[in-house]
């Protein structure tokens, strides 16, 4: 413990290294060989001198000790191994320190073995900016420190740096007795840091496997307070929360460029329609359930080609309407679905109509994954898929024939309607032909029959029979002399001769009334016979 107190008194502002210089993967590790070279060039002769040098002489010198951020350096006065504190190569040798254990502070002190330290920079003479800090610190082993890479005292050191107030920044020579008074009895750390470098302490994150935010419970939401001069400032979200200051390499953002489009994280100059395009960018492909037979044939290369094709498609410039001011048939309040493109004022009453219209702007066409055909409408793709699957959901109600498309069934139904109309025309024609023979029969049969049958018979039968019989019988037998010699002969001749001319005139003038003519003729003959030949009736 006395050796640790002596080392704290020997430190000067130009010889104190970065408190975080020994941290693994720290940015200050790149400058550590320069610091060690400076320390060896300035303070090595004092540590390589006589073994029994007094403690006061080493305190007045400006040599450096081996305790950078850890503070556990080599003693130069009271033990026999003080002459071997630094070997000729400039590396610190191992010395027994009972108050520091290897479990709690293994790789921080310069007395331990350094793997990353190289002293092959003789030409570089640039010095680090001077860092001055005052205060006291204590390193005690943590009881439950299972992680040897990040012991608990170091995190208490970081917590003390963040939660400090504004103490006056003085030189270390003025406060060195206070720092060495009770180094092992005061666990808390109060330290002021002043530097001309405005870069943060941690510019890169340590790559430990499972980062835990409980390691830094206090620094969240705090910043380094400013002190006199250009103080070291830090952004408000401290270690776990800040993205630029404390980057934990868990899942880099550059591995997920496509998720930014899905979340709408685009540039401000993009159109509002870009988000909608990214939402509907995936092509409308054939459902996998309908192409089970083709699943083994179509590999992932086709899908990758499709995705790359549609990812490379850009929004086409929107077409202006031919008549933008022409009113639509449907009022606007009944068309709630408006096109999201800025220069397009189309509105639709149905969402599927809007989706179909958006494909005009995006150029997206649903594609069949079996035949790789593109279609302008998704319903056309659905109909096309049925040609591969053999599905025919539309059946004819008359004959039961099935079709894959509804318009095919409608076209087929028209065939049945035409056949039905033809059958109706044929049945009407057959009914008309069956009613025609019953209607014209009275005209063609009943009317000509009296003219041909009943009319000639009285003229040939009833008329000649009384004339020759009644005339010849009295003339030849009964009245031979009066017929040729008396008065009845001229009257009979004149009367009989006048009857035939009157009868043809009646027949010619009244051809339709054949019955009446025959009756009148018979009546005239009967009167003539009864008048001129009374015996005719008896003979007949």
UniProtKB/Swiss-Prot annotation:
One of its GO terms (cellular component) is cytoplasm. Residues 1-105, 162-240, 317-337, 407-482 are annotated as: Disordered. There is a cross-link at residue 304 (Glycyl lysine isopeptide (Lys-Gly) (interchain with G-Cter in SUMO2)). Residues 64-75 have a biased composition (Gly residues). Pfam families: DUF3432, DUF3446, zf-C2H2. This is Early growth response protein 1. A zinc finger (C2H2-type) spans 337-361, 366-388, 394-416. PANTHER family: EARLY GROWTH RESPONSE PROTEIN 1, KRUEPPEL-LIKE TRANSCRIPTION FACTOR.
